[in-house]
């Protein structure tokens, strides 16, 4: 359980982000979207859970499409959110989303995600939501605040998942350190070839060399 004051503290901090970004969490036409990530004191790349594009729902996705002028981007972001949240928070197996995506590409006669258009992503959003409801017996949560607290719970919980525990054991990271949860305004890496996602270090994490080190993927999220 969380400290009694935490919900109010999160709400106050979220209001501060809204003011900086001039966006409103959950507002259909001007929605603030969030990323929810771990913030452990030692880097554990890929070990902890992450949820991106949080705040998207059937209304805010239309607002994102209008604001960006790119319907394909908006619905691609929504299907990514459904897949990530469905897996990390709701416990729907990751491969079920991937299998559905591959089946859709086969029917369309394409091989790459980039060959799918806005209508394809719209259809996959509907398919993902239907699959989640079938698996869980309840619909995907449309309330952004319910989404947020589900993601916060999941990221805190991921400190104790199997891969994180194994990584800590291999790298002598104490379990009692725990993790923070970072809730940030969403920055999109999937808006085109001039966008990317990646990680950067001021020292090489493998050997401590005083040199910049990093990796990135173009037109992707992570």
Feature annotation, model-predicted:
Residues 1-222:
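Nucleotide/phosphate-binding sheet-loop regions of phosphoryl- and nucleotidyl-transfer enzymes
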């Amino acid at each position: 359980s969380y400290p009694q004051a935490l919900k109010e503290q999160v709400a106050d901090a979220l209001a501060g982000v809204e003011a900086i970004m001039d966006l409103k969490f959950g507002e259909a036409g001007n929605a603030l979207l969030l990323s929810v990530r771990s913030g452990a004191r030692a880097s554990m790349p890929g070990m902890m859970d992450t949820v991106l594009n949080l705040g998207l729902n059937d209304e805010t996705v239309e607002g994102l499409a209008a604001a960006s002028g790119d319907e394909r981007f908006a619905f691609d972001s929504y299907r990514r959110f459904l897949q990530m949240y469905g897996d990390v928070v709701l416990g729907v197996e990751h491969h079920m989303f991937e299998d559905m995506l591959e089946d859709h590409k086969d029917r369309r006669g394409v091989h790459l995600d980039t060959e799918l258009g806005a209508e394809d992503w719209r259809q996959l959003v509907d398919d993902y939501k239907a699959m989640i409801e079938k698996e869980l017996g309840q619909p995907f949560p449309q309330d952004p605040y319910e989404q947020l607290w589900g993601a916060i719970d999941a990221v805190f919980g991921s400190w104790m998942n199997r891969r994180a525990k194994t990584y800590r054991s291999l790298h002598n990271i104490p379990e009692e350190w725990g993790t923070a949860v970072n809730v940030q305004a969403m920055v999109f890496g999937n808006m085109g070839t001039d966008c990317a996602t990646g990680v950067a270090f001021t020292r090489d994490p493998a050997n401590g060399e005083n040199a910049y080190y990093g990796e990135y993927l173009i037109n992707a999220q992570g």
